[in-house]
Amino acid sequence: MFNQHSVEIDWGGRPLKLETGKIARQADGAVVATYGETVVLATVVAAKSPREGVDFLPLTVDYQEKTYAAGRIPGGYFKREGRPTEKETLVSRLIDRPVRPLFADGWRNETQVIVTVLSHDMENDPDILAMVAASAALTLSGAPFKGPIGAARVGFINDEYVLNPTLDEIVDTQLDLVVAGTADAVLMVESEAKELSEEIMLKAVMFGHRHFQPVIDAIIELAEKAAKEPRELKVIDDTEIEKEMLGLVEQDLRAAYAIPVKQDRYAAVGKVKEKALAHFFPEGQEPKYDKLRVAGVFKELEAKIVRWNILDTGKRIDGRDVKTVRNIVAEAGVLPRAHGSALFTRGETQAMVVTTLGTGEDEQYIDSLAGTYKETFLLHYNFPPYSVGETGRLGGAKRREIGHGKLAWRAIRPVLPPHHEFPYTIRVVSEITESNGSSSMASVCGASLSLMDAGVPLKRPTAGIAMGLILEGERYAVLSDILGDEDHLGDMDFKVAGTEAGITSLQMDIKIAGITEEIMKVALGQAKDGRIHILGEMSKALDRARAELGEHAPRIETFKIPTDKIREVIGTGGKVIREIVEKTGAKVNIEDDGTVKVASSDGESIKAAIKWIKSIASDPEVGEIYEGTVVKVMEFGAFVNFFGAKDGLVHISQLAAGRVQKTSDVVKEGAKVKVKLLGFDDRGKTRLSMKVVDQETGEDLEAKQKAEGDAPREAAGE
């Protein structure tokens, strides 16, 4: 019934198994990949005919985690998986980025890759396995995919590189780097690092590339057994159109791409395109070529013009040389009510970045396959359509916004103070108000300034820069601080963020084969120079965190109480803690280990809440004097609330000096009194006294009398 094939190898000390032919047999390609006890299913389906009216590759990649994979039931009312989580979105992008450049030019068939996590062993992150499985499924599918690719995670622990570190090991690593590529070249890198050098980062990339070669060999072996016949792809020769187009608009395009202002340049390019279309599609005549083909050739010619100019003259679209960074204006404290804010402008790219400090109540609960955990640092990136002079629909965060936000998050997180030293929940929002390339790196720069403006003690300021590459045969040019056009028309998008001490985040997407280690080394060195320059410009606005938190930010005081007192502080059904919050106006968060965090923008509120909590969580001391309130008057004395929720009895004989006939002659309910704790009776009841305390001054009369009585004897002894 089943025509099964499988390949198994040892990879990083664990077995990797790739199987096909049993599950999802109606898909064009389907592979079940197992690593340890983590299992994923990758499927590929490609439409039988091209999609009409498109000039791009209609590829969709969806990665999904099923909670049953970890033996759990989803939370929420409906108890089933809902919209994609951030992790699912990020892994979908992680798979998409290295496979997209490997489809044959001209492939316009709808293609969908779906990767489903079926089992998770809590040791091996499914993301790398998902990339491997997707590569294998594409290789088997018959689609014109020039793979396979391999992928690996690289850690750096105790100054040694570690292949595919487990989830436990990744906690201690200085580097979390994912690299993917073919047998010959690296195509994609995504990483977070603790201020590591360019040399360590580059060696990590090459380490990963070497160590995923056995995976590529295994996929090829499986394909030799089970791959489908390659789909036929008609390659259309556009040489005639190219010649005609070049003679018609080359000089006009060169002139248009010499205009430095983006909107003016786009307008000029638009007029050149209109000229070309009018030539190829004259009114009243039957067109000689398909409109999409002509538009595609025009787009390719745009890329060639930009690339030729850079390689031939060393001059870029806006007149810069390959190493120059655009003009920078950095400002901090631009919003009056925000806890921290910054406006970072680099050429025609601008980010308004705002920091908000919150308390434990503001932590984000993340429900992942590995379990639920709390995130105390959030960074959100928004890219509204007006930032590029367009109209569009506003809605939830798109995949690109989630990916760019995570990249900036990775760049900033390594320089944040430990949570036990700075116990705030931190939310940073980057609003891209203008964009012409490298908006994610502008977000990193703005986030660093905004956090320091809020008083967050960063280890060091952090900056980011986007690098590009033009490669033609043996000639190449590495570009610093690329424009949007240089990103679209170039061969590489290489984003590097970090401090003066080292790299904190690196992301690389390469569109062609042939990027050598030497080219990457040049790009990293040039990126370091650019990063140091940008940090210098940022320091003109702010070079370190402000000494005080923002005026409107909450203050947090942290202390500990005995764990056996937590229940008393919270009270039945949270009654006590709610009363403390309502009456003091402070926010209170109590953790399982007895750590208490009290937060408010008002210092008096914090003091009142702390005093109240400590009075509940600690015991009164015998011989100490306390201020209290009479809560009940009885014939035999008065009950006084004197220590948080604790009450004690002032016996009628302890109300005042001399004989007291009636308790109500001395005190009334609600009266404020001063009492001394005498001790506890046989039943543990509290005994208090008013008569030994001066009700005006709170002075201990017994101690005063004793001191006065001892004074003459001491004098006589002398």
Swiss-Prot record:
The keyword Magnesium applies. GO terms for cellular component: cytosol. Mg(2+) binds at D487, D493. It comes from the Bacteria. It catalyses: RNA(n+1) + phosphate = RNA(n) + a ribonucleoside 5'-diphosphate. GO terms for biological process: mRNA catabolic process; RNA processing. Residues 554-613 form the KH domain. CDD domains: KH-I_PNPase, RNase_PH_PNPase_1, RNase_PH_PNPase_2, S1_PNPase. Its main location: cytoplasm. Its EC number is 2.7.7.8. It is found in: Cytoplasm. InterPro entries: ExoRNase_PH_dom1, ExoRNase_PH_dom2, ExoRNase_PH_dom2_sf, KH_dom, KH_dom_type_1, KH_dom_type_1_sf, NA-bd_OB-fold, PNPase. It is an enzyme of class 2 (transferase). The keyword Metal-binding applies. Keywords: Cytoplasm, Magnesium, Metal-binding, Nucleotidyltransferase, RNA-binding, Transferase. Residues 692-718 are annotated as: Disordered. Its cofactor is Mg(2+). HAMAP family: PNPase. Involved in mRNA degradation. Catalyzes the phosphorolysis of single-stranded polyribonucleotides processively in the 3'- to 5'-direction. This is Polyribonucleotide nucleotidyltransferase. The lineage of its organism: Bacteria, Pseudomonadati, Pseudomonadota, Alphaproteobacteria, Hyphomicrobiales.
